[in-house]
Amino acid sequence: MAVPGKKKLVAQEELRKLMKAKQRESSSKKRIESPLAKYNSLGHLSCVVCNSLIKSELLWPAHILGKQHKEKVAELKGTKATTSSPSNTIEYPRITKRKGSEPEKQESKRTKGSEDHPSASTTKLPEEFFEKEKTSSAGNAPSLKLLAGDYEDVDDDDAEEGEEYENAKEASSSLLKPAEIPLPPPTSSADNLPADFFENKMPLVSHSGSVLKADIQEKIVERKENTAEALPEGFFDDPEVDAKVRKVDAPKDQMDKEWEEFQKEIRQVNTVSEAIVAEEDEEGRLDRQIDEIDEQIQCYRRVEHLRDRKDTLQDAKMEVLKSKSNEKWQDEIGSDDEEKLPSLLYQNWREKGAFH
């Protein structure tokens, strides 16, 4: 009897293991493949931008479309644009070719500067997050190529200008923020650059010219709108043109709208007054009906009172008649007896019964 119990326990454990394996497979299939998604050691899903845990993979699209996530993305993009714009506004002196020893010094100083200032990649964001910044920073390639261009026909006297460039760059690096990325120094020739120098995944500094152009366009549009709104009424002789420029309704349309609104208000007032009159009529009708009912009740009461009085009078009359009839009957009986007495007395007693 003990052997079947063990078999059942073993079967239950195997079933549990199979169920857990299936759950793991289903959970692995449902994993979110997104640069913004992150799984911890326990397999819990979290958002890299918001630093918030997400209960289920089904809630990931709703979180991406949420207001908080969009605000965080906009803030990060805004800080990226603000930190990258000052680095491009620094003006460097004219760049010339230096001797072979100068590039080595430049490289050593660049490594020191990179160690002193942390790069923008410490934000722990995915590489494909700022794709727009990468496309906008593509305009820096010509300037970088100019910085890294060939300058073979320069004399050795240009070394002094190279030293001035180094001093200017050191002064500018002290002004850069920790999130900014310094520009690469020029080398002796373009062949020393790696093959994928302009195709790396590191977020490049966006050019401030595009931002300035967008700001200028927005200002122009705002000025145009402000000028159209600032025009006084009647600036143009034609009222229709004046209304069109000031982006308002034409006088005729305005009059029509006002007339329609007036008619609408009149209809509303009429409906309200009709409702009030109907309510008052209904109340008056009910009051009249109540008064009529009260009058009918009073009339019925009077009729009942008259009927009762009639009955009492009839009863009294009947009693009087009965008493009179009794008295008359008694009077008649008494008169008959008195009339018979003398006739009996005057008769002869001898003749009594003679004819019988």
UniProtKB/Swiss-Prot annotation:
It comes from the Eukaryota. Residues 71-195 are annotated as: Disordered. GO terms for molecular function: nucleic acid binding; zinc ion binding. It is found in: Nucleus; Chromosome; Nucleus speckle. Residues 150-165 have a biased composition (Acidic residues). Residues 11-33, 278-322 form a coiled coil. This is Zinc finger protein 830. It comes from Xenopus laevis (African clawed frog). The gene is znf830.
